[in-house]
């Protein structure tokens, strides 16, 4: 009986020893596999695995193996029958430990403290170390994925969004004269349209940039572009000026998020050697947006025949068609963006390892198939993710209803955006943020300020040239005639019109002096900058015309009738004769950016971002002095093209530097803040330079030159990001 009991006891001990040994060997193999996966992209040595392949046991450093530890003679009677499953679990109550026990309980076995025992500073320090390791690994992964079809597809999708931003900036200036007059805007409120759009873009840049760091690049960009497209379309149909302002405000608010989100999104799928060049190529779409807006304005707005009316109150003029056409790039980008994935770098930053891995594999497979290498396997199996620091959200007890919960959620998100923004002024990016603030402000102030000043300087030159082309018709008689075409830039003096019919005529800059109209009919007539001075009308009928009393100067009416006069505000802005030239000059100025874009893209990675940034701003400041010698329209247009061509290189390099200087967790927020500052500087520049147009030419030139040169010198003090990985 005793022998059988001892045999069973020995058998049980032997089985436990075997199970314990198998467990240790399994742990060892799993640890080796995990270590190899983590070391694959961190360039660590694999020597620690070479001597462990055939080990009989796996022990922590500092412990030795005693071959008789499991023998009956070496075993303790006190531990006989003990099983590992019977041990007290961590977290069970084990009594209050002494001070010495507390010190030795965890640290003595060489295990790190749990996160629950660490303060926030320690956790953030560990997270920074994880982010540095992830940055190196992610760069190698992107290099393995290659640059190909996926990046080019995303390039064109994001390019459409950037094009929509460029269109939005130009739309304001092009529709401003027509919209203000068409919507019956008094002079006191005429400047609100331009300011309200920039205000919306300023707030939108800050909000959407911060949101992109919270919910993702793709989601933020989809929402902001949808807001822009919807309210841009809606603004083309509204009739009241207040509602029109509201629509343009929200349209600007939506498009404000395009630039910070687009550049952050695209930079995170580019390898280091491709980043500067391809971000510069992406900047070309902003220029394409300006060219598109200028060309459409040139082709659409001056054509007043492209309009219709529903009664006398609802007028749909050509500038509204222009607004609809300018919303098409935004709609196209929204549709295309739905087929693109989220930024994998953002997903890794927020701890979504599996989703990021799937997207990186998609990028790799897409590019390899395009290269004709579909059999090439994506070798990455594990990617480092930064330590996630939990943030507690306090939800009040009265948030039972859905709208209260929604309010708390919105308030929490806004508070999170604000905290991320404040971190842009923490170490190690605080100094860079201050320098970037100066560079963004000076470049925007000088660029947009002179952009307002140029057209106002050119306009008097255009007026003089237009006056030289005026056709003068004097002392002639016309009887039994019908005119149904456009009359433009003419002066009729001492004329007599008998039994004439003016049907559907567009009068543009036409003046009648000392003329007589007998038994004439004006039907469905539209006039712009047209006046009748000291004229006599006898038995004349006016049907559905826009001839307001102020257009008849010292004129006399005998037995005349007015029927169905057009009500509401008609397009009567005075300098319509220069509309073609204004759009054409803007078209040329935008087209001049093309050489600067090409040069900056080709040289960005060769001469460096800082050389490009500082050199372009200094050269732009110097080029302003040539404006003193501009005495003709063609010379001023040439100076405008030169200035725009030099400035665009500074804009491109500044975009690249800004993206590369901020880490992923605050990249879009920092970019959004700087872009919002850019819009504020643009408004300030418009106000200051606009007030100096009629005073002197020297002050705007000196101001712009000084600001640009100073900003360029500060830009040279920024750290060079050409060789660093994207944090």
UniProtKB/Swiss-Prot annotation:
GO cellular component, as recorded: dopaminergic synapse; plasma membrane; synaptic vesicle; synaptic vesicle membrane
Q: Which InterPro entries match?
A: LD_SV2 (IPR055415), MFS (IPR011701), MFS_dom (IPR020846), MFS_sugar_transport-like (IPR005828), MFS_trans_sf (IPR036259), Sugar_transporter_CS (IPR005829), SV2 (IPR022308)
Query: Among its keywords, does the record have Methyltransferase?
Result: no
Keyword annotations for this protein, in alphabetical order, are:
Cytoplasmic vesicle, Glycoprotein, Membrane, Neurotransmitter transport, Phosphoprotein, Synapse, Transmembrane, Transmembrane helix, Transport
> What's a single GO MF annotation on this record?
transmembrane transporter activity
Region annotation ((Microbial infection) C.botulinum neurotoxin type A-binding) maps to 519-563
One GO biological process from the UniProt record?
chemical synaptic transmission
- Which CDD domains does the entry link to? MFS_SV2C (cd17440)
Show the segment(s) annotated as Interaction with SYT1: 1-57
Q: What job does the chain carry out?
A: Plays a role in the control of regulated secretion in neural and endocrine cells, enhancing selectively low-frequency neurotransmission. Positively regulates vesicle fusion by maintaining the readily releasable pool of secretory vesicles. (Microbial infection) Receptor for C.botulinum neurotoxin type A (BoNT/A, botA); the toxin probably binds via extracellular loop 4. Recognition by BoNT/A relies on both protein-protein and protein-N-glycosylation; glycosylation of Asn-559 increases its affinity for BoNT/A. Also serves as a receptor for the closely related C.botulinum neurotoxin type A2; glycosylation is not essential but enhances the interaction.
Write the protein's name. Synaptic vesicle glycoprotein 2C
Record the organism. Answer: Homo sapiens
What gene does the UniProt entry assign to this protein?
SV2C
């Amino acid at each position: 009986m005793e022998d059988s009991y001892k045999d069973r006891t020995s058998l049980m001990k032997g089985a436990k020893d075997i199970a314990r040994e198998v467990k240790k060997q399994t742990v060892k193999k799993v640890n080796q596999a995990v270590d190899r996966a983590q070391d694959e992209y961190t360039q660590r040595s694999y020597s620690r695995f070479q001597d462990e392949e055939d080990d009989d046991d796996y022990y922590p450093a500092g412990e030795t193996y005693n071959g008789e530890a499991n023998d009956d003679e070496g075993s303790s009677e006190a531990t006989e029958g003990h099983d590992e499953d019977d041990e007290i679990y961590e977290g069970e109550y084990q009594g209050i430990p002494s001070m010495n026990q507390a010190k030795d309980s965890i640290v003595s076995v060489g295990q790190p403290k749990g996160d629950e025992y660490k303060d926030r500073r320690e956790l953030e320090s560990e997270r920074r170390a994880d982010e540095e390791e992830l940055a190196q690994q992610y760069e190698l992964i992107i290099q393995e994925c290659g640059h190909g079809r996926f990046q080019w597809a995303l390039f064109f999708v994001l390019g459409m969004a950037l094009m929509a931003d460029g269109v939005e900036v130009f739309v304001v200036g092009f529709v401003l004269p027509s919209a203000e007059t068409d919507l019956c805007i008094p002079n006191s409120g005429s400047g609100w349209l331009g300011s309200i759009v920039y205000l919306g873009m300023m707030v939108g840049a800050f909000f959407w940039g911060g949101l992109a760091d919270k919910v993702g690049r793709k989601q933020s960009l989809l929402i902001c572009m949808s807001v822009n497209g919807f309210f841009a379309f809606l603004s083309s149909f509204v009739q009241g000026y207040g509602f029109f302002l509201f629509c343009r405000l929200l349209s600007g608010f939506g498009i404000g998020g395009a630039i910070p989100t687009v550049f952050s999104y695209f930079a995170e799928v580019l390898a280091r050697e491709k980043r500067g060049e391809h971000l510069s190529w992406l900047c070309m779409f902003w220029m394409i947006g300006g060219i598109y807006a200028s060309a459409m304005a040139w082709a659409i707005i001056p054509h007043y025949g492209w309009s219709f009316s529903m009664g006398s109150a609802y007028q749909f003029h050509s500038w509204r068609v222009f607004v609809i056409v300018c919303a098409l790039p935004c709609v196209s980008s929204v549709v295309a963006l739905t087929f693109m994935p989220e930024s994998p770098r953002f997903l890794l930053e927020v701890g979504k390892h599996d989703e990021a891995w799937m997207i990186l594999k998609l990028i790799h497979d897409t590019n390899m198939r395009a290269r004709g290498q579909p059999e090439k396997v994506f070798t990455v199996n594990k990617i480092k993710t930064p330590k996630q620091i939990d943030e507690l959200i306090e939800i009040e007890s009265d948030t039972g209803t859905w709208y209260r919960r929604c309010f708390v959620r919105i308030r929490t998100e806004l508070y999170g955006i604000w905290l991320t923004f404040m971190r842009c002024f923490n170490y190690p990016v605080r100094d860079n943020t201050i320098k970037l603030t100066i560079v963004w402000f000076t470049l925007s102030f000088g660029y947009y300020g002179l952009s307002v000043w140029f057209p106002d300087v050119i306009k008097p030159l255009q007026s003089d040239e237009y006056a030289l082309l005026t056709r003068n018709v004097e002392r002639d008689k016309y009887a039994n005639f019908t005119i149904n075409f456009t009359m433009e830039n003419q002066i009729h003096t001492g004329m007599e019109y008998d039994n004439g019919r003016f049907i559907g005529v567009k009068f543009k800059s036409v003046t009648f002096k000392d003329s007589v109209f007998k038994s004439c009919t004006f039907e469905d007539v539209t006039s712009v900058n047209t006046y009748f001075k000291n004229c006599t009308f006898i038995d004349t009928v006016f049907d559905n015309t826009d001839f307001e009393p102020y257009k008849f100067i010292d004129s006399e009416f005998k037995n005349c009738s007015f029927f169905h006069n057009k009500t509401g505000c008609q397009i009567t802005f005075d300098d319509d004769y220069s509309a073609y030239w204004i759009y054409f000059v803007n078209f040329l100025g935008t087209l001049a950016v093309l050489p600067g874009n090409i040069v900056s893209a080709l040289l960005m990675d060769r001469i460096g971002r800082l050389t490009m940034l500082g050199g372009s701003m200094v050269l732009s400041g110097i080029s302003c002095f040539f404006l003193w010698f501009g005495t003709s329209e063609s010379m001023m247009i040439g100076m405008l093209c030169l200035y725009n061509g030099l400035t665009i290189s500074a804009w491109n390099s500044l975009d690249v530097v800004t993206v590369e200087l901020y880490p992923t967790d605050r990249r879009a927020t920092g970019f959004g803040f700087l872009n919002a500052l850019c819009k504020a500087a643009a408004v300030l520049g418009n106000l200051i330079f606009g007030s100096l147009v009629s005073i002197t030419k020297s002050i705007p030139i000196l101001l712009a030159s000084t600001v640009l040169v100073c900003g360029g010198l500060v830009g040279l003090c920024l750290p060079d990001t050409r060789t660093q990985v994207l944090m």
